[in-house]
Amino acid sequence: MAFSVGKWIQDTCDELYELIAKRTQQPTYYNKINFCTDGNEQNENAIPKFFNKDCVNYGQVIKDKEEQKVIGIHKRKVIGNIPFDEIAINNVDGFCSKLRARAGCFVRKTRNFAKKRKQIKNLLHITQTNHNFIESAKWKTPAMKEGLTKRILSWNDIFNKRLSFNI
């Protein structure tokens, strides 16, 4: 859906939620948007800037650590009334693991790094396209689940599609 590149400070977080607000249908009281994140307070500050609090469910998964090793997690409701069993960040953690496995600049403690934010954004756009339109789980891509396409695409489909539009 969206990503933001940079140090995880308030400006970067605001940029992320602004993109989400632009790319999604604005939620309503009866059709709320759900957010689940880790315990960073920047998320708590950014969400109300771009979404009406009455239209949001927001929960946090906070990892309990000892010496950088996760020993447990606990969940908390921050905004709205999201059910505890729906508060999860597994998809984000899985996507981050996928990034680290495929791109050297995302590996922790690496010598290989991207020198410019633009390069990281470009790499993330490619990875996001691959994730959303090409890779499938149970014969469905995320784009198919959202009704954006009816079939699994290939890079050939993406790069060689003839686009038509009026100027």
Labelled PLM ranges:
Residues 1-167:
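Residue-level recognition of single "structural anchor" positions
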